[in-house]
Amino acid sequence: MYTHVDVVGIAEASAALYVQKDRDRYSDVLTTIENFIYQHKCIITGESAHLLFLKKNIYLYEFYSNNVAEHSKALATLLYKLDPEYLTRYTVLITKIPNHWYVINVDQREFVRLYAIPAVKQHLPIPILPFYCTSALTQQELFCLGPELQLIQIYSKLCNPNFVEEWPTLLDYEKSMRTLFLEQFPQRLEMTGGKKEEEEKHESIIKKIILEMVSTRQRIVVGGYIQKNLYNHVLKNRNRLQLITSLNIYEEKDIIQQFCDSNGLKIKIRINNPLLPTNPELRRLTIYFNNTNDDDQSYLIVDMYNTGSYELVPTNQINTLDGSFLIGTPFVQARFLLVEIWVLMLIAQQTKKDTKKIIQFFINQYEMLMNSPWPSMEALFPSSSKRYLGNYVDPNALIKWAQLKLKRIPPFYPGKPDEKSC
């Protein structure tokens, strides 16, 4: 009397057929976009990079350009000329932020987001280490962000409740990207470290500085000290304490310098830009313990990041023999281990220094963290606002603020080139 119907299977088959028909309809548009990216050596980012890396179909292309204003207009014109009487007749270029962010819609659908490469002082673009992936559509070798930068992007979103609807998809991306990332690097950990004798000699002084760093509730531990206390796994002169602060990084510098001066502790503090293209606001404060005036006798003991000054960071609390302090969730810890790896790769590329051993060390730390038994869901994704430390900045409000500062530019319609736009 009753017939079994595979409703889910039928729905999936119908959806797959619809998606394929839709992709066939816009195949020329997608191919033109990829050819443009290839010819102009643009760098794919965001979810587009994840899909490219995993050899899946892309429907919305996000990429960096070294001449974003000209490239956005040229690509919009190319797309319009594909079929100006029908499919691409309604091609429009929208300026979100002049010289920084553009969007191209075709047939009332968003296909392209172009971004300017973030710049440092003197408007020099942040260096992005070249990484290639073969496109599933055109079989061309396209530039994209490397796996370490893509994972940093993923972990940033997994720590941000604004992206909660994307978390299931992001977790799938994370698992696949992490597996591919770890396959590319040697897994052996070099068990030798320099300056062991000298560091042990000053261990009590260094520990005093470190305990002061973790004593305040404005700071979150994200690396180094966690491994030393939880996993009993430390290499001398490598396992520096990693922190996030919710204060201004220059305010932190004054606080730390004042504490060390009042206690007769000799340190050197430097603030630099880690040159992270996916996070240009990031700054790092580095503390070196120096018991003499000889730079060769300086020990790097703390890296502090200003992430909490412009975004919320999820935390957990941990108790040790030295006291209790806040630590970042596993995804926060993973994110900043990868930041260290990125910085070391950049140093190796720009200075030709051999950083292989220390990169292997941080990769080992990352792998150990991600292979550890997962904590509860509450420890991964805190639901209480009290577990988040930092300053929330509404991204939409930030965009509107940037738009108000700059002259508004009307949309550019390639079919009407005489109009003053873009």
Swiss-Prot record:
Its main location: virion. Keywords: Late protein, Virion. It is found in: Virion. Induction: Expressed in the late phase of the viral replicative cycle. One of its GO terms (cellular component) is virion component. Belongs to the asfivirus K421R family. This is Uncharacterized protein K421R. The lineage of its organism: Viruses, Varidnaviria, Bamfordvirae, Nucleocytoviricota, Pokkesviricetes.
